[in-house]
């Protein structure tokens, strides 16, 4: 019987049935329809929280009373199946799951014979985990998708196979990789105890804690030895134990310290030293680790058997045929614009199509414009569009970009734009007419195999236009067509038919052959070197920032002196690539040959080559080759950008996607963040397929990680449901009742199980053990974020706080916090530790995600309010902050807290100025009890400051109020020495960042495709160039910063007025 045919009609109510407020009703039951193999239909009331096993037993007691019971087999021969929330047919093999966690799309369960196909079970689990059914990929019947999935399955299986031979210690390095920081900071020595490191160790299942003073350069195994000796001294001789029988585990975390690195290079120990806390370890017996290893090996071997049984049959060998290369075709490139459908314009409105050929943002030839026609539904052109470029000169990554425009007379504009929103998109005025963009779409000229496209193609277009257009086109847009074809404008075009044989772009060996042929025939090209005078000019051009435009003469000079560039300025490669004529096959061939002998760039410099401006396949392969030099820690630092630039890749199979998969499968920490960066955007139509198939490949290659990730996905689904409940009841219940309802929900066994004992998505080392329900609450803001507190079962460990947000886009916060982490890293590399606190933040879905709670901290607003009886004067109490620090610190601790405050305040002053962080009020600046100041909530960056009635609320470049200065000066008005040191810290920090200005510009440029509201075009990044004064000398830049510093100090009274208004408003609301 077909499952689809007997499904009852869909409910009219679109609200998620698992999120309605009946979930917290006393009975907590739901009516479920059961479909038996005999065709019998039974309806039962079952508890929402019941396990699948319990529900099956309930059903079995009832089936005795129905006809044809004798035709059924034993109960264990059956399992339930349903259609889940991602529209995937799912067989519920794991019967310990609860119904409310399975979350069927409708409350319908079908009893089916237990499946024996392990490959189907794995496919089903992967589909649920990634939030996209694998059947969707199959249904596309897309050769490129199928080819990529086949290759990636083989790639993943090879990775799994390589794990089988690993020793348990190598498996531990792969699964729980230690985090190292190779460089040693000078100021670390000041925080040691007489040059010694103090560590605490206790054996598992023992309360005895041993402390040692050791050299920071000892290896971890030495700590094992000292602990064993100490236990022998105290307890006497027990069973013989070797240091190699134990591994050091960080107390309260899934983090292990082992290997040959000195203790001080482990990130956990370094953080403890910097924060003046005691590193605490548990000595775990190796046999426990080995048991974990053996369990995973069983899962891996089962996965190998599953995969090998489901490998597709190899394709039959194709008949050899003559292949023609496009370099032999000197005909002009042309297409036929056949027609357009669903243009959504009035019948009298004329429409035309603009088409252009691009390589990155470079226009390869003049754009072509069709004739203007009008029509009701279909607009038929049947018009040939010829481009001023020969087929032989088309680069491999050329893309054909289209835009549909409605053309109106200026006089008629007001009457004729019922279906066009002129305020939403930019308009172009030409020859007394107004051109309104209606739709755009892009497609590649060559397919994924390098074959020149031919025949009819229907392109379903997109209607949302970016802020900036190149030649009235959108070349930076996706080359994927709109999957919502039913309502999208469609363009029907026709590429030339290649009747004899298809044309391909030449393979690499032919390209190199061509370059050699050109070089041998033109001796002038071989030299391409200049004298000292030209080198000086060249250096000046190459030293400019990435946003600087090159004029035609400068590009010609760079290309002519390309050998000088390679030998003397290898970092000039991006500018050389912008100087080449990509519409000239001879230049392209010579570049590819030159690229083979170009020195490897440092990874940070190579990142720029992954920008949209550099689409060439071999250039991107070169860039990825440079990135291979990155350590895992460095790769993690830039993972956010590397995932975003996948969107610039026109084809699924590329060097970058393979590189990311390879490193993720080698290091589970990288794997977890790659998983969430991809999964959080898998709902986006333009990248749904691309990100989905990469996620599938990761899951197939990391079956041992799937269980951990599934637990995280389940927990986040529960939090989303709870958040929906709170929003629904927010208007009905007062705050106390709402909090009580939340606690009732969290105490339910389904919630308790789903939200306990999971690795934090924010940090896989942190275990979220058990909810401290009474401390959990929801916050007052519009989206009602959930404030969750976890008690830590580990010896002497603090509680862990997490905020779940649903309805807010956290990606801009993620980017800003990443930049703060990078600044912290660059400062430390230069020997300056400004005690930055870039807390964890992770987008996990469509406008949802998690934020780390920084313990023992309060907002400036709360500190000021608690010290004053009148809200209006609270912001002007300069003693409040210093008194608050004195409340928690005294003596040397107070001096240390003021030092922490001074350094962190300097760091955030410089960071907020450079990044243009806006909306800085007293509720989004916080201070820890230990003195560290830090900023939260980054909704406005790059100089997008809030304004009211056209007047900017924030008039200062960064926040530096007199109560901050009061703390820095230790409460002494004339303490100019302390303030002078603070100012010097700010200036040093600014100059360090400025020296890495190109890196910041590159990283923001790589994020242009993310769709962040305040980062949509190159114009937005211009703010960074201005704030870092990249066009000026270091002396001029420092002078500019000093002026900004004085301005922040001089105008700080305006900040206080803003804070007063904010505090009064906050006090009134509460």
UniProtKB/Swiss-Prot annotation:
It is found in: Cytoplasm; Nucleus. Residues 26-115 form the PI3K-ABD domain. A motif (Nuclear localization signal (NLS)) lies at residues 410-418. Residues 194-285 form the PI3K-RBD domain. It is an enzyme of class 2 (transferase). Keywords: ATP-binding, Autophagy, Cell adhesion, Cytoplasm, Endocytosis, Kinase, Lipid metabolism, Nucleotide-binding, Nucleus, Phosphoprotein, Transferase. Residues 935-961 are annotated as: Activation loop. It comes from the Eukaryota. Residues 772-1053 form the PI3K/PI4K catalytic domain. Pathway: Phospholipid metabolism; phosphatidylinositol phosphate biosynthesis. Phosphoinositide-3-kinase (PI3K) phosphorylates phosphatidylinositol (PI) derivatives at position 3 of the inositol ring to produce 3-phosphoinositides. Uses ATP and PtdIns(4,5)P2 (phosphatidylinositol 4,5-bisphosphate) to generate phosphatidylinositol 3,4,5-trisphosphate (PIP3). PIP3 plays a key role by recruiting PH domain-containing proteins to the membrane, including AKT1 and PDPK1, activating signaling cascades involved in cell growth, survival, proliferation, motility and morphology. Belongs to the PI3/PI4-kinase family. This is Phosphatidylinositol 4,5-bisphosphate 3-kinase catalytic subunit beta isoform. It comes from Rattus norvegicus (Rat). The lineage of its organism: Eukaryota, Metazoa, Chordata, Craniata, Vertebrata.
């Amino acid at each position: 019987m077909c499952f689809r045919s007997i499904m009852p009609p869909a409910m009219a109510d679109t609200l998620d049935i698992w999120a309605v407020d009946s979930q917290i009703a006393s009975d907590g039951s739901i009516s479920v329809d059961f479909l038996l193999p005999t065709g019998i239909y039974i309806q039962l009331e079952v508890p929402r929280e019941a396990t699948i096993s319990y529900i099956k037993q309930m059903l079995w007691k009832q089936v005795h009373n129905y006809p044809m019971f004798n035709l059924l087999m034993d109960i264990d021969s059956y399992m339930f199946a349903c259609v889940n929330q991602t529209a995937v047919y799912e067989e519920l093999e794991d019967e310990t799951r609860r119904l409310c966690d399975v979350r069927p799309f409708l409350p319908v369960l079908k009893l089916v014979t237990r499946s024996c196909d392990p490959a189907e079970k794995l496919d089903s689990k992967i589909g649920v985990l990634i939030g996209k059914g694998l059947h969707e990929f199959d249904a596309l019947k897309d050769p490129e998708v199928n080819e990529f999935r086949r290759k990636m399955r083989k790639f993943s299986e090879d990775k799994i196979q390589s794990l089988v031979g690993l020793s348990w210690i190598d498996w531990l390095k792969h699964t729980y990789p230690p985090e190292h920081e190779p460089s040693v900071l000078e100021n670390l020595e000041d925080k040691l105890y007489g040059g010694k490191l103090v560590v605490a160790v206790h054996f598992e299942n023992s309360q005895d804690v041993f402390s040692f003073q050791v050299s920071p350069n000892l290896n971890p195994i030495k700590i094992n030895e000292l602990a064993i000796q100490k236990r022998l001294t105290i307890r006497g001789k027990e069973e013989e134990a070797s240091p190699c029988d134990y591994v050091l585990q960080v107390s309260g975390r899934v983090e292990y310290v082992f290997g040959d690195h000195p203790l001080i290079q482990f990130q956990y120990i370094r953080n403890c030293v910097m924060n003046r806390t005691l590193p605490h370890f548990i000595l775990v017996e190796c046999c426990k680790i080995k048991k974990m290893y053996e369990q995973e090996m069983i899962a891996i071997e089962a996965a190998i058997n599953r995969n090998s049984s489901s490998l597709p049959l190899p394709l039959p060998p194709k008949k050899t045929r003559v292949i023609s290369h496009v370099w032999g075709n000197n005909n002009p490139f042309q297409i036929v614009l056949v027609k357009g459908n669903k243009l959504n314009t009035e019948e009298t409105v004329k429409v035309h199509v603009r088409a252009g050929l691009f390589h990155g943002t470079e226009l390869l030839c003049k754009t072509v414009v069709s004739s203007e026609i009008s029509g009701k539904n279909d607009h038929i052109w049947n018009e040939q569009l010829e481009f001023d470029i020969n087929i032989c000169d088309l680069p491999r990554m050329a893309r054909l970009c289209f835009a549909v425009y409605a053309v109106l007379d200026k006089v008629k504009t007001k009457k004729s734009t019922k279906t066009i929103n002129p305020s939403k998109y930019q308009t172009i005025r030409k020859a007394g007419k107004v051109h309104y963009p209606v739709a755009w779409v892009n497609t590649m000229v060559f397919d994924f195999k390098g074959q020149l496209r031919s025949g009819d193609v229907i392109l379903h277009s997109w209607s949302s236009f970016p802020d900036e257009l190149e030649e009235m086109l959108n070349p930076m847009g996706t080359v994927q067509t709109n999957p919502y074809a039913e309502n999208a404008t469609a363009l029907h075009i026709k590429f030339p038919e290649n009747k004899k044989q298809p044309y391909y772009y030449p393979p690499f060996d032919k390209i190199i052959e061509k370059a050699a042929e050109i070089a041998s025939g033109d001796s002038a090209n071989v030299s391409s070197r200049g004298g000292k005078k030209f080198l000086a000019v060249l250096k000046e051009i190459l030293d400019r920032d990435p946003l600087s435009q090159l004029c035609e003469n400068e590009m010609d000079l760079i290309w002519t002196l390309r050998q000088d560039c390679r030998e003397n300025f290898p970092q000039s490669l991006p500018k050389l690539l912008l100087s080449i004529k990509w519409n000239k096959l001879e230049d392209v061939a010579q570049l590819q040959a030159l690229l083979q002998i170009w020195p490897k760039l440092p990874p940070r410099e190579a990142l720029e080559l992954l920008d949209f401006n550099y689409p060439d396949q071999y250039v991107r392969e070169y860039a990825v080759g440079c990135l291979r030099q990155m350590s895992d820690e460095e790769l993690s630092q830039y993972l956010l950008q590397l995932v975003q630039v996948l969107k610039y890749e026109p084809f699924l199979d590329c060097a970058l996607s393979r590189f990311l998969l390879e490193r993720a499968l080698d290091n589970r920490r990288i794997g977890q963040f790659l998983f969430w960066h991809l999964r959080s955007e898998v709902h986006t139509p333009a990248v749904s397929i691309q990100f989905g198939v990469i996620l599938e490949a990761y899951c197939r290659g990391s079956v041992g990680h799937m269980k951990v990730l599934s637990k995280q996905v389940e927990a986040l689904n529960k939090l989303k449901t709870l958040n929906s409940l709170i929003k629904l009841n927010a208007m009905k219940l007062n705050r106390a009742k709402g909090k009580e309802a939340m606690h009732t929900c969290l105490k339910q066994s389904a919630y308790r199980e789903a939200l306990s004992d999971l690795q934090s998505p924010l940090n896989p080392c942190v275990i979220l053990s058990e909810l401290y329900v009474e401390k959990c609450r929801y916050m007052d803001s519009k989206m009602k974020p959930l404030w969750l507190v976890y008690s830590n079962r580990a010896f002497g460990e603090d509680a862990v706080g997490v905020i779940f947000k649903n309805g807010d886009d956290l990606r801009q916060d993620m980017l800003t916090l990443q930049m703060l982490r990078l600044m912290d890293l660059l400062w430390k590399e230069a020997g300056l530790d400004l005690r930055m606190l870039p807390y964890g933040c992770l987008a996990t879905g469509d406008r949802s995600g998690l934020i780390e709670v920084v313990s023992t901290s309060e907002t400036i607003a709360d500190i000021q309010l608690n010290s004053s009886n009148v809200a209006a004067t609270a912001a002007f109490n300069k003693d409040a902050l210093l008194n608050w620090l004195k409340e928690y610190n005294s003596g040397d601790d107070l001096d240390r807290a003021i030092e922490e405050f001074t350094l962190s305040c300097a760091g955030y002053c410089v960071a907020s100025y450079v990044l243009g962080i806006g909306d800085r009020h007293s509720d989004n600046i916080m201070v820890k009890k230990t003195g560290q100041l830090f900023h939260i909530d980054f909704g406005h960056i790059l100089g997008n400051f809030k304004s009211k009635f056209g007047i900017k609320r924030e008039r200062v470049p960064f926040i530096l109020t007199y109560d901050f200065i009061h703390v820095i000066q230790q409460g002494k008005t004339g303490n100019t020495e302390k303030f002078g040191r603070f100012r010097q810290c700010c200036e040093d920090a600014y100059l360090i960042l400025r020296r890495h200005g190109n890196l910041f510009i590159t990283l923001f440029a790589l994020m242009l495709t993310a769709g962040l509201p305040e980062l949509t075009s190159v114009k937005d990044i211009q703010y960074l160039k201005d704030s870092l004064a990249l066009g000026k000398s270091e002396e001029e830049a420092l002078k500019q910063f000093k002026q900004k510093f004085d301005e922040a100090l001089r105008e700080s009274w305006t900040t206080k007025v803003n804070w007063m208004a904010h505090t009064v408003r906050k006090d009134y609301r509460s």
